[in-house]
């Protein structure tokens, strides 16, 4: 039934329209999520809307630029938002300065929505025929290759959904402190899983079966790990300082 639906949409010339529509819906869902999530980080409705209007257009533009550079300045194709996840915190810092909010809170506030975009956006990739897996006899029909392929896009959706749930749990556990830890762990969890999932994609490999997007994912893991090391060291130093400022009776020195 699913294969028949994909084939029918392709034959009617609807594939790209449906894909673009779902991508836009994903953006709207992200915005709605952030509007409801804003109170956790002490943001007003207007601040939330302004933050979204600063961060997402800037991230999209950066995505186009990075794709253009990777394509040898030839075209703007092969766009994928994964390219900008490492750099999004820098855009968040700018948004935080504009809104006079904590940079750490702004960064952690945005983190779950990054993974949420993957949940929705990838769900419709099979209709467009992009991000496809390798040929598979029991797979879904791909309108580009006109063969059945492994439905890795939906596997990526499931993994991204698990990451969203994990980030929300982590943020709550941290009492929405806005230390940057949530985004750092987003980079690690999403980057590591995406690196592995890239091996299921039937795309161009650069070296040892590793694709360009897999390298971006690996870079995410490296940056996220370094980020967590810095945060853990800061927490360690704070704990040491707190012990120094407390006398043996447990009272804070004045």
Label each residue range with its predicted role.
Residues 1-254:
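Hydrophobic, membrane-interfacing alpha helices
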């Amino acid at each position: 039934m699913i294969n028949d639906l994909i084939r029918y949409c392709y034959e009617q010339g609807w594939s790209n329209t449906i894909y673009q529509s779902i991508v836009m819906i994903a953006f709207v869902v992200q915005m709605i999520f952030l509007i409801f999530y804003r109170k956790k980080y002490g943001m007003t409705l207007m601040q939330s809307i302004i933050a979204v209007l600063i961060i997402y257009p800037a991230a999209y533009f950066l995505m186009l630029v990075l794709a253009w550079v990777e394509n040898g300045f030839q075209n703007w194709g092969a766009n994928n938002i994964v390219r900008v996840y490492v750099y999004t915190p820098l855009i968040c810092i700018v948004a935080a300065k504009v809104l006079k909010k904590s940079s750490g809170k702004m960064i952690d506030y945005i983190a779950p929505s990054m993974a949420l975009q993957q949940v929705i956006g990838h769900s419709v990739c099979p209709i467009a025929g992009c991000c496809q897996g390798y040929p598979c006899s029991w797979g879904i029909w791909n309108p580009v290759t006109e063969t059945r392929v492994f439905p890795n896009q939906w596997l990526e959706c499931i993994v991204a959904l698990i990451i969203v749930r994990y980030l929300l749990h982590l943020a709550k556990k941290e009492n929405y402190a806005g230390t940057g830890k949530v985004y750092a762990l987003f980079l690690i969890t999403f980057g590591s899983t995406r690196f592995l999932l890239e091996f299921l994609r039937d795309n161009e490999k650069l070296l040892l079966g590793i694709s360009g997007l897999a390298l971006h994912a690996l870079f995410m893991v490296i940056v996220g790990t370094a980020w967590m090391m810095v945060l853990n060291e800061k927490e360690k130093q704070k704990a040491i300082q707190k012990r120094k400022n407390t006398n043996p009776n447990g009272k804070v020195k004045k």
